[in-house]
């Protein structure tokens, strides 16, 4: 490992027939290499919850796979620090233009730049969709129906939960009965107990949060030590990110993963794509492929499709419907904060150890469509100081409030937003370091969002007050997970991809990430993205076996 002029360590590189082993200090694993001019079955752009999972499952099905990612390949045991500022290296901080009535804040909790994508810094909350959300128009009267059946998705949820060894409660209080989680639930910290006391006082159910972080040993990975820096990268590998789960499996099965490889444009000839142009090590390359999968998430996926416009596809690839970039959904993430009489020390452990989904499953007593859950919180000190500064606290006032840090508690929602065509991603006039137009992200809340926010604040305030909190205040303009922009559906006129995540326009172009969501639900999306990726891999194998997909499995 080399260092730059400041003494900062450069990340290890996947090259020369080997890949960094994230589970061993200084470790390496053998990795198959492909030539750029050697057509592989699949080139995948992105290695997060969608692309990393799909790379693993396709390679295990016997296909030749090259996965490209703009981010670095880290070994968490030696390269992740207990330092919020240092770990900003995991975020996608490239320039984007954000406008609209409610411009989004991008670059931290809703995007990632690393092998493993944003799963490297996600909060590990792993929740299934409510079954009715897959047919929200038919069953609940809003949004659109998915082209997927919830019972099939339930099987893939189980596959992902087993693959990640999700730690969760013996019985989950909402939805259809399900098997026990693979690992026991984590011990609750004091912040989670605040949520529990408040929910019980309100007479609503709560539960320990199902988390993709280990509560017991798994091979060379240690269980969670309650270090508390989960959203800044897990230094012990307890977090079951794509970096330490799907990616090592993909490499072992014969996939090549190329780090620091920025996709520039997808090449198309007629009604087929032929590969991906990308920038790596100061040179532009072209990887030939029989199929291209885009898995760059809800901003970079539509951006790449739009950047790849040509004479035959002047609006961008897969965009005959004109819907690429449209129907962006940013889940609501408002919070109620308060001060407790006793110390909470909310930084101890994963940030969301308890939750309630009561308002996801209760359809009465609401003046809005959709639902939300709320979770216990544990912001780190710098993040908390930023929140206080945003309230206008500076100087001595900020110091006094920070002195109460260990006595704080809070609840935060993940709330469903409705798909609106005007919330969208387009290309701006400004250009990035590669000379490409940056993404313009236009976003606005609607009346349904505002009604949900008011309802959530009223309920969370009741819960905090019942738990003994005082000096309650609101963080009222925040969003989290992104979805939509390349929606799936049953009609090529109203969607971009079909149920198998395959472009309606170009049969060897696939999209596999949260951008395919027609609706977003009121829970974290990572489990659903990974379940869709597992399903897509199986569907590709089925389609290829009957000659409907251009790929040839080779058992290694």
Protein language model annotation of sequence segments:
Residues 519-538:
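A conserved FAD-binding loop/helix module that cradles the flavin
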Residues 208-215, 219, 223-232, 237, ...:
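A glycine-rich dinucleotide-binding beta-alpha-beta segment and adjacent secondary-structure elements
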Residues 57-60, 64, 71-81, 236, ...:
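Glycine-rich loop(s) and the adjacent beta-strand/alpha-helix scaffold that form part
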Residues 104-109, 146-150, 321-442, 447, ...:
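FAD cofactor-binding and catalytic pocket of flavoenzymes
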Residues 2-42, 60-61, 542-556:
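Extreme N-terminal leader/targeting segments of oxidoreductases
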Residues 85-174, 234, 345-348, 414, ...:
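Redox-cofactor-proximal catalytic regions of oxidoreductases
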Residues 137-263, 481, 487:
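Conserved redox-cofactor binding core of oxidoreductases
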Residues 42-67:
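N-terminal Rossmann-like FAD-binding beta1-loop-alpha1 element of flavoenzymes
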């Amino acid at each position: 490992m080399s260092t730059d002029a400041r003494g900062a360590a450069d990340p290890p590189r996947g090259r020369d027939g080997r890949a960094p082993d994230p589970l061993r200090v200084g470790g390496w694993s053998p990795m198959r290499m492909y030539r750029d001019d050697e057509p592989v079955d699949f080139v995948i752009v992105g290695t997060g919850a969608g692309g990393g999972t799909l790379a693993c499952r396709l390679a295990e099905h016997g296909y030749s796979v090259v996965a490209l990612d703009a981010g670095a390949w880290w070994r968490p045991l030696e390269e992740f620090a207990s330092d919020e500022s240092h770990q900003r290296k995991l975020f996608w901080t490239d320039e984007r233009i954000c406008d609209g009535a409610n411009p989004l804040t991008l670059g931290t909790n809703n995007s990632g730049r690393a092998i493993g994508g944003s799963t490297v810094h996600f909060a590990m909350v792993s929740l299934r969709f409510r079954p009715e959300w897959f047919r929200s128009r038919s069953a609940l009267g809003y949004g659109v129906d998915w082209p997927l059946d919830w019972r099939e998705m339930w099987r893939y949820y189980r596959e992902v939960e087993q693959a990640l060894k999700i730690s969760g409660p013996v019985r989950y209080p909402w939805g259809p009965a399900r098997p026990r989680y693979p690992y026991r639930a984590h011990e609750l910290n004091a912040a989670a107990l605040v949520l529990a006391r408040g929910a019980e006082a309100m007479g609503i159910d709560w539960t320990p949060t199902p988390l993709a972080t280990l509560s017991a040993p798994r091979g060379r990975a240690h269980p969670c030590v309650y270090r508390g820096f989960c959203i800044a990268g897990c230094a012990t590998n307890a977090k079951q990110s794509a970096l330490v789960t799907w990616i090592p499996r993909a490499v072992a099965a014969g996939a090549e993963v190329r780090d620091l490889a920025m996709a520039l444009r997808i090449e198309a000839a007629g009604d087929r794509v032929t590969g991906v142009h990308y920038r790596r090590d100061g040179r532009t390359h072209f990887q030939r492929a029989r199929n291209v999968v885009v898995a760059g998430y809800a901003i970079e996926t539509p951006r790449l499709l739009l950047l790849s416009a040509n004479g035959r596809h002047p609006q961008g690839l897969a965009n005959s419907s004109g819907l690429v970039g449209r129907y962006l959904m940013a889940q609501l993430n408002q919070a109620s904060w308060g001060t407790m009489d006793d110390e909470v020390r909310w930084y101890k452990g994963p940030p969301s150890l308890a939750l309630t989904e009561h308002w996801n499953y209760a359809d009465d007593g609401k003046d809005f469509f959709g639902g939300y859950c709320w979770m216990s919180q544990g912001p780190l000190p710098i993040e908390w100081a930023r929140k206080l500064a945003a309230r206008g606290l500076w100087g001595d006032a900020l110091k006094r409030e920070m002195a109460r840090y260990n006595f704080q508690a809070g609840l935060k929602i993940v709330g469903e937003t409705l798909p609106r065509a005007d919330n969208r991603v387009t290309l701006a006039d400004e250009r990035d370091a590669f000379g490409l137009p940056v993404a313009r992200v236009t976003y606005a809340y609607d009346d349904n969002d505002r009604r949900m926010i008011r309802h959530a604040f009223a309920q969370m305030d009741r819960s905090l007050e019942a738990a003994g909190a005082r000096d309650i205040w609101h963080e009222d303009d925040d969003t989290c997970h992104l979805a939509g922009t390349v929606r799936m559906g049953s009609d090529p006129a109203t969607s971009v991809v079909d149920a198998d995540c395959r472009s309606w326009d170009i049969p060897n172009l696939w999209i596999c990430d949260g951008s395919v969501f027609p609706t977003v639900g009121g829970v974290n999306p990572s489990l659903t993205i990974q379940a869709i990726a597992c399903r897509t891999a199986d569907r590709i194998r089925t389609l290829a076996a009957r000659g409907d997909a251009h790929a040839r499995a080779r058992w290694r």
